[in-house]
Structure formats: structure tokens, C-alpha cells
Amino acid sequence: MAEPDRAAPVVVAEAKEVEPTSVPRVLLTNDDGIESPGLRLLAERLHGSYELVVAAPVRDMSGSGTGIGRFDNSKGIELRRASWNGIVAYTVDGPPGLAVMAAALGAFGPKPALVVSGVNAGVNTGHSVIHSGTVGAVLTARTFGSHGLAVSLAYSDPWQWESAVASATKAASWILGHRGRPMVLNVNVPGLPVSEILGTRWADLDEFGYFRVAMADHVEQLLQFEISNRPTGGQVEVGGSEAGRNPSTDTALCHAGYVTMTALTAVEPAGRPEVPPDAVIPMPAGGATLRSV
């Protein structure tokens, strides 16, 4: 993956800088589960270049966002060691956000400098990334002061895993060369052979994403959704519109054949709403009121 054409601001919350080491420590996770070929292939490529630990869900946890699941002090969460030809790997009975939190708190050794999530089978573009376990894992990493890299691959038959792995390894090296505050990058790779990829572009988040979701029906005890991700007439339907409408978005650029990079932020304060200094927000009956100070 070539260096991006232009710089884009990376806005991050206050956190300590990640200290560079001679051999950076990297955590690899995903939301497709420990058996995903994208996870295994990326682990094999990263192993040897970094102090790598793999910790991934025991089953598919797609759509888990930044969730960590439900747990309490009286019960432990199952963690099993896997044998991966010299690669340290664990299965976690929970979503990827939980694996990242555990790593940040020392479950697998020192906190990683970088958390890589992927390679996801299917793109993660647009504002719908908030629901993605792949992206949620790296947003969780950022809240703990680590760099985060989410890598997703567009569908093709056969899957072009090599293209995604090649892009991921270059992006990981690029991020770890960053000496500022931790950053989060969301990378989407087109389902093309490496030789056919047009290049790398910084991209804006699309309004929706590659998938179009609609409410098909609902009754008293059932919600039925309709999900579509098939290109139509050479364009991708995105929330009822064409991806080509805004060519600078991650959905459109990836569909056109580019590897896309989008900088994301973790949760941070948004600042006080713009209200008059004497504005009062009414609280529930019997309570107090909130007044600007």
C-alpha cells in the first residue's frame, strides 16, 4: 500500500503517547472469530516482524461494535490457548472489544503499541462502522492509549486475502512509525488482486455504508430487516442512493478499486452545547436544574 496522497487531520482524545520500542508489541483480533482465514493469514505475515499476540472471539461476533459483553466478578470468562506454529494465540469467549480491553489491562503481557483488527470478510465503510466489531476493537484500543488499525476486504470470488494482508502490513508499519498521539485508521481493501488495485486514498466516511438496511416488516414480537449489498447498474446502493454520488467516500473509492484509509476518533467530550449563559435545562419532577457556570 503506497503512502497516502494527502494528509488528513487525526483528532484524538487526551492520552499518553505510545512509547516506541525496538520490537513493537502488536495485538491481533477480529470479529469473525478465531477460525477466520483472514485472521490466520495476517497473523502469519505479522509474526516475526513484531511481538505478536492473537486474541480473537471463539465464534463470530460481527456487529458487536465496541461491546465487551456481560460479565461479573463471580464468574470468569473462558480463555483458551491455541496452537499456531509458534504464534501466541488465544480464544476469548466474548467480543473483540473484550479481548482488547483484557490486553490493555495486562492479560497477555505488556499493553500493545498497536491493535490490528481483521482481516474482516467484507468491507466496513460509512457511518455504519459504529456497529462493526472490527472497527469497535480499534476504537477500544484508542481509549486505552494504543494505536488501532482495522482492515476489511471487499467480497470477491475467490477472496483476495493477499491484497488485504499486504495492505495491512504496510499500514501497520506506517502507523508504528508515527511518533505522535495514538491514531485509529479504518482501512478497506477492494476485492482485487494486488496488481489491479489502483492505489491508496484518504477517504471520507460515507453517509451510510456498503450495506443498505431497511425495515421490511414488524409485528408485535418480531422485527424483520432487509439487507442488500449487491452492486446495481455498476453502482453500489448506499442508504437508497448511489455510491458514485460522492466519489470521495470510502464506499465509492473502495468500489472503484482503491484501498481507502479513514482516520477515526474514539469517544471524547463534545463540548458544551451552544446555549445562552443563563439557559436552564429542566430536570424530572423533584430534581434540580442544570445551569451554565
What is each stretch, according to the model?
Residues 9-29, 36-106, 110-111:
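A cross-family phosphate/adenosyl-ligand binding-site feature
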Residues 29, 55-57, 117-120, 150-152, ...:
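Short beta-strand segments
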Residues 32, 60, 95-96, 120-123, ...:
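Short glycine-rich anion-binding loops that position phosphate/pyrophosphate groups of nucleotides
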Residues 103-109, 136-147:
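Alpha-helix C-terminal capping segments
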Residues 114:
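Short, Asp-centered acidic motifs that coordinate Mg2+ and/or phosphate
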Residues 123-132:
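Glycine/threonine-rich flexible loop motifs
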Residues 142-164:
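Glycine-rich phosphate/pyrophosphate-binding loops
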Residues 163-293:
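Electrostatically charged, flexible surface regions
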